[in-house]
Design a protein with these regions (language model features):
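Bacterial N-terminal signal peptides
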Residues: 8-16
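Positively charged n-region of N-terminal signal peptides that target proteins for export
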Residues: 1-6, 110-112
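Serine/threonine-rich low-complexity intrinsically disordered regions
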Residues: 1-2, 16, 317
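Short amphipathic alpha-helical "recognition" segments used for binding
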Residues: 6-7, 266
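Short helix-onset patch at the extreme N-terminus, typifying the N->h transition
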Residues: 7-8, 28
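Subset of outer-membrane beta-barrel
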Residues: 23-326
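Sec/Tat signal peptide C-region and signal peptidase I cleavage site
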Residues: 17-22
Length: 326
């Protein structure tokens, strides 16, 4: 009897986690350095082909802790077109998700003063799985224990991005359809930021990201990054949902510290650690760790021209779009 009670509790808990996971999108601390995850209009802004990776580990020390690994490709094509691809593996307990997304964008020049509008589209497929095979029970012959369910979901998304050499503002719906099998809600994203050169070597870059879905609290991330030339950077990000953004002690939020440096001209590495604050404060095991790696190849799919997009000079971050210094 106790075995079935425990099994029901485990099933109920992880199914609810799976449902919550289906409702909520992935959230990376390095969103300002790699934004095609939530907006396809960000691809194709750099001259060189780039390959980047983000790995996020949460609740270290707990069995079945959330783990997300991702790889992103970004390339500029002819005629102000850009293309990108994302591969993401996400695991939590007995649930897993393998995602592939193809992003394409067209960058429209609005005037001669570097005002531009990007239009993006995303096509994606996501394989969701929930399996208790990896869990240990006394009676392994019980057919209820060997439970596995799988769904493959296709979707489409859209994005807009307005930007100059000083600021940007974007809006996107990365997954338009709302599949009922995993109770996934349509999310709306609004992001923006600006850059200001403090002197010849230092640049400050505040950013924000607002995420909203029906019948869920609004999620807000606010970050400030400080860049020293093209060599290293550090910053801080605060995120919370609902009233937690205004009153962290009321419903909890998270605080992240971000840093990174350029190892060689073509390779950048970043790291961030996130701690829960407010009612979610716990042990050090509840912290999340994230590693960011970006490799900018020497490969250019198109030749540079006077009509090309402004070249970004800080770690390949398309949000900044710094002007070249003499």
């Amino acid at each position: 009897m106790n075995k079935y009670i425990v099994l029901n509790i485990v099933l109920f808990s992880f199914l609810n986690i799976h449902q919550i996971q289906g409702q909520q999108e992935l959230n990376f601390n390095h969103y300002m350095l790699n934004s095609q995850l939530f907006n396809p209009a960000f691809v194709g802004l750099e001259e060189n082909l780039t390959i980047s990776s983000i790995s996020n580990l949460q609740w270290l020390g707990f069995e079945g802790n959330p783990e997300t690994n991702s790889i992103f490709l970004d390339a500029k094509l002819k005629n102000n077109l850009g293309i990108g691809m994302e591969l993401i593996s996400d695991k939590i307990g007995p649930t897993s998700s393998n995602f592939i997304g193809i992003n394409a964008a067209y960058h429209l020049k609005l005037n001669k003063n570097s005002h531009r509008l990007s239009l993006g589209i995303k096509l994606s497929g996501n394989d969701h799985n929930i399996s208790l095979n990896s869990m240990s029970f006394d009676d392994i012959t019980d057919p209820n224990v060997r439970t596995k369910d799988s769904y493959f979901i296709t979707n489409i998304g859209f994005g807009l991005r307005y930007y100059t050499d000083k600021l940007y503002l974007s809006f996107s719906i990365p997954y338009f359809f709302e599949p009922k099998t995993i109770n996934k809600k349509r999310h709306y994203y609004l992001s923006g930021g600006f850059k200001k050169e403090l002197n010849d070597k230092l640049l400050i870059n505040p950013n924000f990201l607002i995420k909203k879905a029906s019948n869920t609290p609004t999620s807000i991330d606010v970050s400030t990054m400080l860049f020293y030339e093209d060599l290293f950077w550090f910053g801080i990000n605060y995120g919370a949902s609902g009233n937690g953004f205004i009153s962290p002690n009321g419903s909890g939020g998270n605080l992240s510290f971000i840093s990174g440096f350029k190892l060689i001209p073509a390779l950048s590495i970043g790291y961030s650690v996130t701690s829960q604050i407010g009612n979610w404060t716990g042990s050090t095991n509840s912290r999340s760790h994230e590693i960011y790696i970006k490799f900018r190849t020497s490969k250019k799919l198109v030749k540079s021209s006077n009509e090309s997009l402004p070249e970004n000079k800080v770690n390949g971050d398309p949000n900044l779009l710094l002007k070249k210094r003499n």
